[in-house]
């Protein structure tokens, strides 16, 4: 009997024992910084001369690790291994696959602060953000294991007296997992284990700026008893290895989290039927957002300001769910804006090794340059009332930036920035606010701050996003509680951490026996 699922609790770092335990995790990670990590294909550890170099975005001089880089030849070898392994893995008992996830979750739970410390070093996450990332990785494994146990016997269908009918789920085949750098543990682990527990084999290509945490997760899967060849670790260039695997005729599905442009490119390439291919590939994609917090005139204005600041600047705004637009009723606009500026100026920005840092760096030089270019656009399209400065001398740091008085059709209101920049826009009334919120090609998350029940119900029906929150921020979905995924250009409408997510990695088979 499996106990009911509950999400992994977040660590309270105001408790001295927890603070000391996290500091020990940092020391442990510091003891192995700069190590080399191999590719893993069929259990074989392969070292290549060509390496992906991972550095600390808060301290560019600090080497986190060097990970061997796959070539097309090694990617082909991994595909052949995954394809062969699938023939046995697909017949493994769902209970056994679920047990491996439970064991992996237990291992990560024991090493929780170590994994979070890796995220501090490799992704530049403050303690609370790193802790939440690790907790979510645990949640995905615990939740998907239980979901597989629910789905293992299929779904009931009708049978006449003369027959016995069954509706079962069977795995798809070899999946290519292309995971993101912003949640390099949680999303990577969730995408991988969802595919594996469903009976598929996997080629895992992690983001090139955060491959070390993925290499460490491979150690966990091996310790948990996952057979060799089920997950094959093939870090590499997207243009070389990624394209090759997406195009490969033996690839059955691609699971991707990342930018809109790359997601569209994968979707287009996967749609093409290549020589030797006998199926239509499935694509599971989550591709970002342009997320809005709407503040009604009948709202808790202090809660509104706090929700905007937390959602805009948590992990430096580098969440696909981050608030990049605050649309506020004109009657309360000045009050909410001024309070948000006050709260933003209280935030501490720096190296997240320290406990009390609210905001760390952005991901890399490319991210820094992109965000600063939007800050420059903000100076033209609105008024910068907080932040606006960046410093890339030691790490890639950008001050949390509020741009006020932005027109609803401005670039800052349309284009995904993926950094600590939020645009404030006035709305004439609630209907106007919803119209502005929906005026985007994305549809991932949103929030409405209102004490008007009619307005809440109107937003519930008309605010077109996959995850809509009321009287709170627009980030922080919890596995199994708020299944996550959006509409339109935010992806393929999949819901990670939800009851139908595993079914995306399987196909239904009907059998009918005449009695």
Swiss-Prot record:
Enzyme Commission identifier(s): 1.2.1.88
GO biological process, one term: proline catabolic process to glutamate
Reactions that this protein is recorded to catalyse: L-glutamate 5-semialdehyde + NAD(+) + H2O = L-glutamate + NADH + 2 H(+)
Annotated GO MF terms: 1-pyrroline-5-carboxylate dehydrogenase activity
Active-site residue numbers: 286, 320
GO cellular component: cytoplasmic side of plasma membrane
Pathways per UniProt: Amino-acid degradation; L-proline degradation into L-glutamate; L-glutamate from L-proline: step 2/2
Disulfide bonds: none
Domain of life: Bacteria
Classification via Pfam families: Aldedh (PF00171)
Keywords, ordered alphabetically: NAD, Oxidoreductase
Family: Belongs to the aldehyde dehydrogenase family. RocA subfamily.
Protein name: 1-pyrroline-5-carboxylate dehydrogenase
Organism: Bacillus mycoides (strain KBAB4) (Bacillus weihenstephanensis)
Gene designation: rocA
